[in-house]
Design a protein with these regions (language model features):
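Conserved GNAT-fold acetyl-CoA-binding loop/helix
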Residues: 20-43
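Conserved acetyl-CoA-binding loop-helix of GNAT-fold acetyltransferases
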Residues: 87, 93-106
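A short beta-loop-alpha structural element at the N-terminal edge
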Residues: 4-16
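A conserved beta-turn-beta hairpin within the catalytic core of GNAT-like acetyltransferases
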Residues: 72-82, 92
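Hydrophobic adenine-recognition pocket in adenosine-nucleotide-binding enzymes
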Residues: 8, 85-87
Length: 108
C-alpha cells in the first residue's frame, strides 16, 4: 500500500487527535489528553502557529503524524523539537515512521 507524507490541514485535526489518543492509550495515560480538535486547529493554523504537523496518508486516511514546534537554543539559534511521531498500530513496520522523520529532517 502506498502512502504520502504531506503538511497537515485543519480538516486533519480530528484524525491527528485520534492518533494522539492512541499514543496516550499505549503510554497507559488515556485520561491525560485534554486537548480538543478545536484547540489543535486554533493553535496550529491561526495567528502565529504554535506547531507544525506532517501527516502520512493511505487512501485518504491519516495513519501517522509528526508534530513539531519551534524552540530556541542559546547555542544554535532557531531549532525545531519533534514532540510526537505516531503511526497507527495497523500500519507500523511499513517505513511510514521513517518517512515522517525524514520529512522533519529535510524541512528543518
Amino acid at each position: 500500500m502506498d502512502y504520502i507524507i504531506r503538511d497537515a490541514k485543519k480538516n486533519d485535526m480530528k484524525s491527528v487527535l485520534k492518533l494522539i489518543q492512541e499514543l496516550a492509550l499505549f503510554e497507559r495515560e488515556p485520561d491525560e489528553v485534554i486537548i480538543t480538535e478545536d484547540q489543535l486547529i486554533k493553535d496550529g493554523f491561526y495567528g502565529h502557529p504554535k506547531f507544525k504537523c506532517f501527516v502520512a496518508e493511505i487512501e485518504s486516511e491519516v495513519v501517522g503524524i509528526a508534530l513539531l514546534y519551534p524552540r530556541y537554543s542559546t547555542w544554535k539559534g532557531h531549532a525545531m523539537h519533534l514532540e510526537d511521531l505516531i503511526v497507527t498500530e495497523k500500519h507500523r513496520g511499513k517505513g511510514i515512521g521513517f518517512a515522517l522523520f525524514s520529512k522533519f529532517i529535510k524541512r528543518f
